[in-house]
Amino acid sequence: MTISSPVIVALDYPDAAQALAMAQQLDPAKVRVKVGKEIFTRSGPAVVDSLHKLGFEVFLDLKFHDIPNTVAGAVAAAADMGVWMVNVHASGGQRMMEGAANAIANHAQRPHLIAVTVLTSMDDSDLQQVGVVDVPKVQVQRLAELAKASGMDGVVCSAQEAGLLKQACGAAFELVTPGIRPQGTAAGDQRRVLTPVQARDAGVDYMVIGRPITQSETPTDVVDTILRSLA
């Protein structure tokens, strides 16, 4: 099943039981779900399989970053798992990204292959500490253009950079954005945040939303409110 919703719910739980309990409260016709490092390390591919059985398309958010052969193998394994989207770190370089793209080029269920540019938790001072002298938007554009040249379908970026990246990389280049918070919710540990409407208007294709949905007493109502605001 392929859905048109831009909302991806981050199932950032320590174990599969909690993630699946939340997933059972959501509608796979309205949202996709994201599986990250902690739950995947604890539960492995079984959690992805369980989410598939519930009808969800899954974004496997493991941000692979290693030598080209290792990343290519990992991305191929993710494709074999049937995930809808998988990501790698753009800072791994062109050969690493090209290897990942080539590894799934002919896969029958090729997932969307996305590169991570600058983590949305990082600001100017964080970049300077790791030797990047440019401000985030400059580094993001540099890595996004490299990702496109390397065969990526799009990038993970902040919504603030979306307009710049659509102009630089084209309308078809997919932008996946965490740090999206519905109006009136806390920013949490994401430093560069926008509301869903602001993100949509900026050019974001897919919005990763976690705690505003998963920590709500009525997660389906929050999803419906977000989708209505985007209609």
From Swiss-Prot:
Gene3D superfamilies: Aldolase class I. One of its GO terms (biological process) is 'de novo' pyrimidine nucleobase biosynthetic process. It catalyses: orotidine 5'-phosphate + H(+) = UMP + CO2. One of its GO terms (molecular function) is orotidine-5'-phosphate decarboxylase activity. Transmembrane segments: none annotated. The lineage of its organism: Bacteria, Pseudomonadati, Pseudomonadota, Gammaproteobacteria, Oceanospirillales. This is Orotidine 5'-phosphate decarboxylase. It is an enzyme of class 4 (lyase). One of its GO terms (cellular component) is cytosol. Belongs to the OMP decarboxylase family. Type 1 subfamily. It comes from the Bacteria. Its EC number is 4.1.1.23. Pfam families: OMPdecase (PF00215). Homodimer. Pathway: Pyrimidine metabolism; UMP biosynthesis via de novo pathway; UMP from orotate: step 2/2. It comes from Alcanivorax borkumensis (strain ATCC 700651 / DSM 11573 / NCIMB 13689 / SK2).
